[in-house]
Structure formats: C-alpha cells, structure tokens
Amino acid sequence: MSLGLNAVYVASHWDAVTEGAAAAGREAPSRSEWRIVRDVWVAETDEEAREGAINGMLGRAWREYLRPLFSAGAYPFVSFMKHDESMSDDDVTIEYMMENLWIVGSPETVTEKLRNLYHTVGGFGHLLWLTFDHAEDSEAYETSMRLMAEKVMPNLQDLTGN
C-alpha cells in the first residue's frame, strides 16, 4: 500500500507487481488497475488548504497515531517516507509530510501535484483518497470533496494509467 510513502518508493511497487506476474507465468495487469493511496486536502487557496490539513483531522491522525506508529518497531516504516535517505527520522515532521507526501492545496495546486505523482510513479488508474473522521468540521471536509470532484478531477481525465 502506498500510504504516506514517497513517490519514488511507490513507483517500485509496480516493479514488484510485474515481477510477481512474470514469476507466476501471468501477464502483468494494466497500470489502469493500479490504485494509489494518498492523503488529500483541497481548499479554495493553498493557505486555507495548508491550515485545514495541519489543524484538521488529517494532521491530527498523522500527529497522534500514524506518524508514531510508522516510527515504531525494528524496521520503522518512516524510512520510506523520506525523499533523501540521509534525512533524520525526526525531520519527517507533519509539515514535511504535508509538503512532500500529502496532496494539499488549491484546486490548481492539487491538480499539479496529482499530475506530478502520476508521472513520477509511471501512471496509475485510481486514486484512493485516505480520509479520517471529519465530524468536528464536516463542512470543510465536504468543501474539500466538492472541490476535488468539481475542480480537480475534470482536469485529470487524460490520466488513465494506459
């Protein structure tokens, strides 16, 4: 699963899919079947999106649960979140994740970030938007979903994974 991982590492997941298919004597599936998981937050402006991501449930879930979980154990998952292996684990902050791993911004920024992700990983067919319980601010969540549906996705129809 691509949850919270840097795009270059996620791209290697497709290599594992094709290698596994070959080892099983099967034809590799189409990239259009590949699903990529990303944390997404869209608002009218980049500033509003950053504020909503950091101070809303997205930031809270990573700050209080996922980031600590990914740092635990003998093989901390946090190492796959870094864009540079020489980074300290402590440098993988919520702000770092928002800038480098999450898809956060205005509709224009989110469109650009999703295009960049698509090209970095070599193409995919489905974006799975990881979401959390936004009951405390359902209006902002609904706005984010609406902007994604109405302002972002129509501009990405050419990205089919083929």
Label every PLM stretch briefly.
Residues M1-N162:
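Active-site-adjacent structural elements that line small-molecule/cofactor binding pockets in enzymes
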